């Protein structure tokens, strides 16, 4: 077993061997992505990935574009609606919105995340 453990285990830990192997020199941190805030939404984009993350906070109505979108309900509840149909998502639920325009409705105190390609 060629493992050098530094902690978080009941197995033998070799702190001095870990410190010998570890590179403790400072490095540049990646740039912090500042959100673009508009009303009840915060959009995180332009961070080197081909998608954007939109945080929807509290009671809001957010248009859903004709693109694939992952919807994650962290707290509260949300309703997705399009063409007269509705889908309800509660805390802990994840949904997938596929290439159709619609609307996301969230309730007071909700925290919902949308992840979609840019």
Show the residue positions of the predicted features.
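Ligand-binding loop in jelly-roll beta-barrel domains
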Residues: 1-5, 86-90, 99-118
């Amino acid at each position: 077993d060629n493992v050098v453990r530094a902690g978080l285990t009941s197995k033998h830990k070799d702190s001095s061997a870990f410190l010998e192997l570890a590179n403790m020199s400072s490095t540049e941190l990646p740039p912090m992505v500042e959100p673009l805030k508009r009303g009840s939404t915060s959009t995180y984009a332009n961070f080197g990935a081909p998608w954007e993350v939109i945080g929807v906070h509290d009671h809001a109505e957010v248009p859903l574009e004709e693109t694939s979108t992952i919807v994650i309900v962290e707290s509260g509840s949300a309703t997705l609606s399009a063409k007269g149909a509705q889908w309800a998502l509660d805390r802990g639920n994840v949904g997938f919105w596929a290439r159709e325009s619609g609307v996301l409705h969230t309730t007071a105190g909700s925290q919902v995340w949308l992840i979609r390609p840019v």
